Amino acid sequence: MKKTLGIIGGVGPLATMFIGEMIVRLTRATKDQDHVHTIIDNDTSIPDRTAYILDPTKENPVPVIQKDAAKLVAAGAEVICIPCNTAHTFYDDIAKASPMPVLHM
């Protein structure tokens, strides 16, 4: 049984599109229905991760990422991924708040 993948995007909009393309290209599919069911939330309003890491008085991106994960789960995602190296600095806080697994890079 295939799982539905939720992608928290916008933390590098091109990275979001790149991972989507790679998932399609690397899936061994002979027809459309063989592909991974994917839900993408390309949320470009997520505060700058690097700015917050360098200066914790800046806006914390974690609550927005957690909210996006919750939206994806509500939409049917059974596993979450975030195509952003910097966002994984906050992996523990994001994963702890998600009822579904969050893939780590």
Identify the meaning behind each predicted range.
Residues 31-33, 94-105:
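Short, acidic/small-residue loops that bind anionic groups at enzyme active sites
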Residues 15, 19, 61-64, 68, ...:
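General structural feature for long, well-ordered alpha-helical segments within catalytic domains
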Residues 56-61, 79, 99-103:
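Short, flexible loop segments at the rims of nucleotide/cofactor-binding pockets, characterized by
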Residues 75-91:
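N-terminal glycine-rich "phosphate-gripper" loop used for MgATP/nucleotide binding
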Residues 51-52, 89-97:
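Metal-dependent catalytic neighborhoods of phosphoester/phosphodiester hydrolases
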Residues 7-8, 82, 105:
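Small/polar loops that bind or transfer phosphate-bearing groups
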Residues 66, 70-76:
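Non-catalytic positions within long, well-ordered alpha-helices that form the structural scaffold/packing
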Residues 2-60:
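N-terminal glycine-rich anion-binding loop in soluble enzyme alpha/beta folds
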